[in-house]
Curated annotation (Swiss-Prot):
It catalyses: adenosine + phosphate = alpha-D-ribose 1-phosphate + adenine; S-methyl-5'-thioadenosine + phosphate = 5-(methylsulfanyl)-alpha-D-ribose 1-phosphate + adenine; inosine + phosphate = alpha-D-ribose 1-phosphate + hypoxanthine; adenosine + H2O + H(+) = inosine + NH4(+). Gene3D superfamilies: CNF1/YfiH-like putative cysteine hydrolases (3.60.140.10). Its EC number is 2.4.2.1, 3.5.4.4, 2.4.2.28. It comes from the Bacteria. Zn(2+) binds at H55, C91, H108. InterPro entries: Cu_polyphenol_OxRdtase, Cu_polyphenol_OxRdtase_sf, Cytotoxic_necrot_fac-like_cat. Purine nucleoside enzyme that catalyzes the phosphorolysis of adenosine and inosine nucleosides, yielding D-ribose 1-phosphate and the respective free bases, adenine and hypoxanthine. Also catalyzes the phosphorolysis of S-methyl-5'-thioadenosine into adenine and S-methyl-5-thio-alpha-D-ribose 1-phosphate. Also has adenosine deaminase activity. Pfam families: Cu-oxidase_4. GO terms for molecular function: adenosine deaminase activity; copper ion binding; oxidoreductase activity; S-methyl-5-thioadenosine phosphorylase activity. This is Purine nucleoside phosphorylase BB_0467. Belongs to the purine nucleoside phosphorylase YfiH/LACC1 family. Homodimer. It comes from Borreliella burgdorferi (strain ATCC 35210 / DSM 4680 / CIP 102532 / B31). SUPFAM superfamilies: CNF1/YfiH-like putative cysteine hydrolases.
């Protein structure tokens, strides 16, 4: 994967026929402003599709007539005419592309979505649409990484009975008596038994001052977008 920094966004290039981007400062939109007019780097032919995100594990198959702002946190589509959009302020954006079936997907995966296994549910959706998992390319976009994402002992205790010790050891780090969580590591280890092509941007929303971070700024948000070319 090649990460390219543009004026208003990062681009994650894994193939010539798909576009994956993550916006950065000073680009800033409110939800009610989501439209092609305000995403001037998205082709006018693409219909913007997005959800009312509530940290769920709900995923929608998107057709051209999909109604925006339904409650959920994942989108999948085989349409050439749509751009899938999700908004972030520290949570993990996960992009999907089947280079054979030409299917795109996008997940907003906060810790709640991750712990509810939304990424596995997206894989099931791809298989249901005819994808072979070996043809999938998955990209973890910018998120609040374990260098910065401090959590409480109660947070760790609440998930300790739900997942294996190996998975937790791969996802949590202790430094100087403090506990830190890495959302991408959690999801990466969930997928360890699958034959998948996975790429990690390794960009931290808290560290990088050109990205919006709720924990650092308490305001604003970035957007992840994916569309076929």
């Amino acid at each position: 994967m090649k990460t390219i920094e543009h004026e208003l966004y990062y681009e994650f290039r894994i193939a010539d026929d798909v576009k994956m981007i993550y916006t950065k400062k000073p680009f800033n939109l409110k939800l009610k402003e989501l439209s092609n007019d305000n995403f001037n780097f998205v082709p006018r032919s693409k219909k913007i599709k997005y959800l009312k995100q509530l940290h769920t594990d709900i995923i929608y198959k998107v057709e051209d007539d999909f109604i925006n702002f339904q409650e959920g946190d994942g989108l999948i589509s085989s349409s050439l005419d749509v751009a899938l959009v999700a908004y972030f302020a520290d949570c993990l954006p996960i992009y999907f592309y089947d280079s054979v079936k030409k299917i795109i997907g996008l997940i907003h995966s906060g810790y709640k979505g991750s712990f509810n296994l939304i990424i596995l549910k997206m894989l099931f959706m791809f298989e249901k649409m005819g994808s072979a998992l070996k043809d999938l390319k998955i990209v973890f976009g910018p998120y609040n990484r374990s260098c910065c994402y401090e959590v409480s002992e109660i947070f760790l205790k609440e998930v300790s009975n739900k997942f294996s010790k190996d998975l937790l050891n791969a996802s949590f780090v202790t430094r100087d008596g403090k506990i830190y969580f890495d959302n991408a590591s959690f999801n990466l280890n969930l997928l360890s038994s699958f034959n998948l092509n996975i790429y990690n941007s390794k960009l931290c929303t808290y560290c990088l001052k050109n990205l919006y971070s709720y924990r650092r700024l308490r305001e604003s948000q970035s957007y992840a977008l994916i569309w076929r070319i």
